[in-house]
């Protein structure tokens, strides 16, 4: 879980556009966020296995 202070800091408008970054909407993790779903890889995997993300299925080959 991300610190509440870091989440609040990220929500404030940044002075420069390059300082903005994505954060997982579920847990607040700043790294490996899938932009389309706004989730980190860990939360995405959990929700995909539960079938809570429409259109996502487990790959097999």
UniProtKB/Swiss-Prot annotation:
Gene3D superfamilies: 30s Ribosomal Protein S14, Chain N. Pfam families: Ribosomal_S14 (PF00253). PANTHER family: 30S RIBOSOMAL PROTEIN S14, SMALL RIBOSOMAL SUBUNIT PROTEIN US14B. The keyword RNA-binding applies. Its cofactor is Zn(2+). This is Small ribosomal subunit protein uS14B. One of its GO terms (biological process) is translation. Belongs to the universal ribosomal protein uS14 family. Zinc-binding uS14 subfamily. Keywords: Metal-binding, Ribonucleoprotein, Ribosomal protein, RNA-binding, rRNA-binding, Zinc. Binds 1 zinc ion per subunit. GO terms for molecular function: rRNA binding; structural constituent of ribosome; zinc ion binding. The keyword Kinase does not apply. Zn(2+) binds at residues 24, 27, 40, 43. Binds 16S rRNA, required for the assembly of 30S particles and may also be responsible for determining the conformation of the 16S rRNA at the A site. One of its GO terms (cellular component) is small ribosomal subunit. Part of the 30S ribosomal subunit. Contacts proteins S3 and S10. It comes from Oceanobacillus iheyensis (strain DSM 14371 / CIP 107618 / JCM 11309 / KCTC 3954 / HTE831).
